[in-house]
Amino acid sequence: MKNEESGMKNFYLNKMFVLAVILFATCVPGFADNHRGRLQIGTGLLYERGMDLTVAYEHETRYHNAWEYFGNVYLKWDECASCGHVCPKSFWSNYNTWGLGVAYKPCVTRGRNHHCNLRIGGSLGSDRHNVVGSVHAGYEHSYSLRKGWQVYWQVKSDLMIGGNDLFRTGVVIGVKLPIK
């Protein structure tokens, strides 16, 4: 009699365990490919005597394709006419631009912990006096880390419309932080 009761208890415990596993598996969201957004911060050097800072929100879609909504600040320094080298005034006050834009990043190759995207987009902004538009093209390589973090590097080329520069090209490195 005791054997039958313990057998029934084990049967119900096994049933409860299986039910709990099924509920857990269906109710808890997965994190492998969740298409959540990332905050992206990157900085780099551009030819000729330029520095770039980009802060962006990246929304990843299927197969590592992504949309990027970004704000960009560019600083171009020059040598000081009076002292002959780069001083704080010639560094910070020479030529500055800012812009807001959108870029589409189709994935061209994927690996185990990395993926590569083309970066195609446009932006609109201003320097100190005029409206400045730009067309962006480039290549981005991202490496996945733990907890959804990524590090990346970009080779970027910008065609400037209405600014002092016509072309800007350079390398940017940065980090992508997951937004939950």
Where are these regions (language model features)?
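Cleavable N-terminal export/targeting peptides
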Residues: 1-36, 179-180
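Short amphipathic alpha-helical "recognition" segments used for binding
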Residues: 6-9, 13, 19-20, 56, ...
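Short glycine/proline- and aromatic-enriched beta-strand/turn motifs that initiate or cap beta-hairpins
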Residues: 30-77, 170, 176-180
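Solvent-exposed loop/turn segments connecting transmembrane beta-strands
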Residues: 41-54, 92-96, 123-135, 159-168
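Gram-negative (and chloroplast) outer-membrane scaffold detector with strong preference
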Residues: 58-151, 177-180
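Internal, hydrophobic beta-strand segments that form the core of beta-sheet-rich folds
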Residues: 154-155
